[in-house]
Amino acid sequence: TAYRRQRQMCIRDRFKNKAQEGRTALVFSDDQGLGAFICIKNENEPIELKGGTLAACNRVKISTMKIAERFRGQRLGEGAIGLVLWKWQKSGTDEIYVTAFDKQDLLISQLEKFGFHKAGYNLNGEGVYIKSRHNIDYSDPYKSFPFINPNFHSSGYLIINDTYHDTMFPYSELKNNTLQNAVAMNVSNGLSKVYVGAQYSKLPYDVGDPILIYRRYTTGYGKRYRSCITSFCVVTKIIQAKENWNHLMSFETLLHKIGNKSVFNQEELRQRYSHDRNLLVIEMLYYGYFGEGNNVNMDWLDRNGYWGNTYPALIPLNSTAFKSILEKGNIDVSNVIID
């Protein structure tokens, strides 16, 4: 419609003005129009508070964060904050902050979930919410996002067959930042992922530990070279729903815990709940990816001592091994695992 075209022109003009001011604008839209509009800029100046001043340092300011009402309460808000935190991580600046009035309770709850804390009120009466890379709260994977706890207990592999992997992680081969835009701004495929498996042995990792996502190639020859690590996550929940044929929770409880984060539909989940001997649910927060040309294959893992004779999902990886694999995947480890 003419109205929509005019609206899009206004948005483009706004982007142009923001760019001229040295800002970055991030946008998500769908068939109904604008879904989210986020604007960030770099600063190095004091922040005046009622009763004090925050000294100048290198900061990213979220100057605008608007999410359409139809998306509030959905995963878009979580994804939008995640995307901004990735941008902040890449910038290398000390802090990121945003201002919000107390009545913006939904936004504030999301900020606090991701580790922002209120430093005080500015002179306009807005709360100033800050996150610093020098004071990361590692008590919770959301609060520490996108930084991994340097003192994690152990890591390991999550083995996912290629078909399911490409549904859960459809962006693992995309170039540049298109991946993070796609994952953060897709309501149905947000930052949190759920794996439903039939494992019964104790896992080598726990909640709060990082894991490496291994895409198992299942068709044709060359599995040693085509099966590979594509991404890394941090575990947020481990739920044993069924053990040795014994149901440990009702199917309705299982559905409630999984929500809309599984690649399986309700009927497929019911089949697994009924017929699998064991049922294990691993919920994880997506922290990063290696990207096209950087995926680490089984051959390299084996030649470097990170594979073995046991089932791969049970192989424990210490901090040195985990960092080595990230480095092979062309990840700047010093900007992902920080003290």
Predicted regions and their residues:
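Single conserved hydrophobic/aromatic residue that forms the stacking wall/gate
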Residues: T1-I11
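Short coil-to-beta-strand transition motifs
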Residues: Y221-V234
